[in-house]
Regions:
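Short helix-coil transition sites and intra-membrane helix breaks within transmembrane domains
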Residues: 63-73, 218-226
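Small-residue hotspots at the loop-to-helix junctions and early N-terminal turns
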Residues: 91, 245-249
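Conserved kink/hinge residues within transmembrane alpha-helices of Major Facilitator Superfamily
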Residues: 68, 105, 131, 259, ...
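Generic transmembrane alpha-helix signature in multi-pass membrane proteins
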Residues: 76-77, 103-114, 198, 217-219, ...
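Central cavity-lining transmembrane alpha-helices of secondary-active solute carriers
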Residues: 100-106, 279-284
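Juxtamembrane transmembrane-helix boundary motif
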Residues: 1-60, 81, 87, 111-215, ...
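Interfacial segments of multi-pass membrane proteins
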Residues: 75-89, 211, 219, 228-243
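Hydrophobic transmembrane alpha-helices of secondary-active solute transporters
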Residues: 60-64, 214-219, 255, 259, ...
Length: 323
């Protein structure tokens, strides 16, 4: 209890200290900061965009929790579509946003046995390697090509969310040899029903091959990959929904780290973009959790689908030089 109180009190203080430190450093090096933001594509006073991003990401954090989607999948298309930043910098910040959420959630999920380390490690090895390749491809391609591909991907994600029907505890009658050899099985306790569920996987090889594509897309677009991890783990491989969600969140802390290093190494992560975005999403998530009990998930879900369709279409048109 004391630990939870300390965490709740300490996180806002730490976030405020980070923001103050970033703004103080920026004020001392104003010409360099203005030049850096200019390279990112921003115009106007240097302090305006971090404040706008902070407020925007606060709203985004609330919506992400209520809709049950990762912040990264909303952050990249919306910020690239409605802010004057270059896409490379948006993708770098998007990976940092997804990574921050995953690192915060990972230890708790492992402790509650909602994330399976045996399931995550083989998947993470494939996805993180491919995320590095995806990041290198994304930075090498012309911006308009990446915008077109991003728009098409966001439209696909919106359709996937609309059509997907996850199964709480899929029935796996015949686990395959690869899943058994890799130890992809376990037991988790469902607190809501008070029952223990034993689970195992099937169609393991096709599932692992899917993570090659997921890893490349995560690195190329800076989206994180929770939107794709859960359907593959749950619907294709037969992992219970709660374990799939928990393992997916833990996976992001490994997959996004490898891709984020590429963007950091190329100078595509600007603290004045990344830190306000992370802090805004963090505070928004706290508010979203409190509103979750009162919200109507169906309405929020359709609202997010609508936002993604609009953002995907805007990115597609921007890449084609129309919007």
């Amino acid at each position: 209890m004391k630990r939870q109180i300390l965490l709740k009190a300490g996180l806002p203080v730490l976030a405020a200290a980070l923001l103050i430190a970033v703004f103080a450093m920026a004020a001392q090096n104003e010409p360099a900061v203005t030049q850096a933001l200019g390279q990112a594509g921003a115009t106007g006073p240097w302090w305006m965009w971090p404040l706008v991003l902070l407020f925007f990401c606060f709203i985004l954090g609330i919506i992400a929790v209520l809709a049950g989607v990762g912040g990264g999948v909303l952050y990249v298309p919306l910020v690239s579509g409605f802010f004057p930043f270059h896409l490379d910098f948006v993708r770098g910040a998007g990976l940092m946003v997804a990574l921050a959420g995953a690192l915060a959630a990972g230890p708790g999920l492992l402790k509650r046995n909602l994330a399976s380390l045996r399931l995550a490690l083989p998947v993470a090895l494939i996805a993180s390697s491919c995320a590095i390749i995806g990041a290198l491809i994304g930075l090498a391609l012309p911006t308009n090509v990446v915008q077109i591909a991003l728009g098409a991907t966001i439209l696909f994600i919106a359709i996937l969310i609309l059509k997907s029907k996850n199964v709480a505890v899929p029935e796996v009658k015949n686990p395959d040899a690869l899943g058994i050899a890799l130890g992809m099985n376990g037991v988790y306790h469902d607190a809501s029903s008070g029952k223990d569920y034993a689970w195992k996987t099937h169609r393991t090889l096709p599932g692992l091959l899917m993570f090659i594509v997921i890893g490349v897309m995560a690195g190329m677009f800076g989206l994180g990959a929770g939107w794709a991890n859960v359907p593959v783990l749950n619907l294709m491989m037969g992992v219970p929904l709660k374990v799939a969600v928990g393992t997916s969140k833990f996976l992001l802390s490994i997959t996004d780290t490898s891709a984020a290093w590429i963007y950091l190494n190329k100078g595509c992560v600007i603290p004045l973009m990344a830190i306000p975005s992370i802090v805004g999403l963090m505070f928004g998530s706290f508010v979203g959790v409190r509103l979750l009990a009162k919200a109507k998930p169906k309405f929020i879900r359709y609202m997010v689908i609508g936002v993604l369709l609009f953002a995907g279409a805007k990115a597609l048109l921007k890449g084609l030089g129309i919007g």
